[in-house]
Amino acid sequence: YLMLQLLETLGLKALEIPTDPRTGMSVEALELASRQGGIAACLIVSNGSNPLGCVMPDERKRQLASLTAARGIAVIEDDIYGDLHLGNERPWPIKAFDQAGNVMLCASFSKSLTPSLRIGFVAAGRYRSAIALQKTLTSGATNPITQHVLAEYLESGAYERHLRGLRRCYGQQVEAMRLAVARHFPAATRITQPQAGYVLWVELPDSIDTTRLYDRAIGENVAYVPGELFSPSGMYRNCLRLNCGNPHTPEIEDAVRRLGSIFSAP
């Protein structure tokens, strides 16, 4: 949702493409939209889409790479959650199926290690020169000391060991939050089963407005992200995103209970 605000400040328009909570962005819907023209770029999180947590199947990624290359649509792929997959194997990014250098693969270590490193990377394909120029103009050089420290850490194998433990913790925390929501939220509530990352997308009955109830939740010292913020057209007012990035303590369980009471009140 912060990306929507950034696009707005740049004077760009965002077109919503339907997304399946299990298989990700609809390639068919993107293809239909591209027939109308005017689409310059496709911004996508194919692994651990925020807020759904879904991972696109490889065949869908291959189709998207082929379609966008044929239509001249640049792909900006944010793979920041790829290392935080909750399955047995790390999913491939769309970039792996890019035959035309049309995909700009971006990621960082802010979610898997710490945001204080301020280190990310981009495999920019045909856009490499333009991206390098923009990097120089906007932020100049990156601290070489932290880059070398991180490089040695990655080469040592410690990062992979760290990821195994982190994925296990996130998987447990996501499942604990899912069970808590199922216990305390209104009947007919629907909850995603994330395949990567550490957020839950919760769909409440249509009569519940999570934007309107947000201030009441803050008054109970409970925070969430209203679903409306993930849509430039104001959809998903009956939905919300929950963060599972912290251990599921009794305090968090009680916060979920209080939130469920707010949503269940007449």
Model-found features: residue ranges?
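PLP-dependent class I/II
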Residues: 1-266
